[in-house]
Every structure is written in C-alpha cells, then in structure tokens.
Design a protein with these regions (language model features):
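ATP-binding glycine-rich loop module of kinase domains
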Residues: 2-48, 62-67
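Short small/polar-residue motifs
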Residues: 13, 51-58, 104-108
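Conserved structural core of kinase catalytic domains
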Residues: 28, 45-90
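Active-site Asp-x-Gly
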Residues: 34, 80-82, 124-129
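Protein kinase catalytic-loop region centered on the HRD/HxD motif
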Residues: 93-100
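Catalytic activation segment of kinase domains across protein kinase-like and atypical kinase folds
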Residues: 100-129
Length: 129
C-alpha cells in the first residue's frame, strides 16, 4: 500500500513531496527550476502519443520553483530490470529539433499511474546539461 504522504530528498536538484494523488517537485536550485520548466514545456508542446509516456503535468509554479504532477507508484528495481530485458519501455521517437530522449531507463525515472500505465516521472535529462 502506498503511503498518503511521502517526501523524497534523494534528488540532487529537486525534492519531491507526494500527497494523495499529487506529486510536487520543488527545485533545490537553478538547475531544479530549469528541470521543472523543461518538463512543463515538454508536456505542453509534445504529441498525444508522446504524452502517453509522460507523467501528467498539472501546473508549473512561476520560475519553475515547483511542478505539480499526477502521482505515480515508483517502479521497483526488479520491475525495471524485467522491462529492460523484455524491451518493454516505451519508444521515444526522435523528432527534430528535439533534444532526444528526455528520460533514462532506470527505476527512479519511471512509475505507474493509478490506471496501471507506465510513465516517465523524471523527463528532464536534457535540462541537466
């Protein structure tokens, strides 16, 4: 069972606070604000097919200070390994002038929504550069 309230401080640029069905990513620094803005922008401008691979963005606070998303159940390391072995992660199609894959295939970057759909919960990799 998923706890109603959790705080995840493992991220180097953001802290994630989960409460009920929501997840709030709070920026620790300028890079965290850039990552929040990147995810909000990508969610807003991408295609429906790509959006189905991404955890939904509900709101972005000014300057990227915070990003409100739908909460997803984190993947376990075992589930992640199974998805890698089965080549079951969704395919992100390259569309110029995009930056390429916005996520990595690691457990901490993926989760499942309440409907069971596999989504990237951290898709700001290009903003880290």
């Amino acid at each position: 069972m998923t706890p109603i309230f959790t705080i995840d401080k493992r991220g180097t640029v953001r802290i994630t606070i989960c409460l009920g069905p929501w997840a709030l990513k709070l920026a620790r620094n300028a890079t965290g604000r850039r990552c929040n803005r990147f995810e909000a922008d990508l969610w807003a401008r991408t295609t429906e097919a790509r959006r189905n691979m991404l955890c939904p963005v509900l709101a972005c606070l000014p300057f990227g200070v915070g990003l409100l998303m739908q909460r997803a159940r984190p993947l376990s390391e075992d589930e992640c390994q199974h998805l890698k072995t089965a080549d079951a992660f969704p395919d992100w199609d390259y569309v110029p002038p995009d930056e390429g894959h916005p996520f990595e295939h690691k457990a901490s970057d993926w989760g499942r929504l309440s409907d069971g759909r596999l989504v990237a919960v951290d898709y700001s990799a290009p903003a880290l550069d």
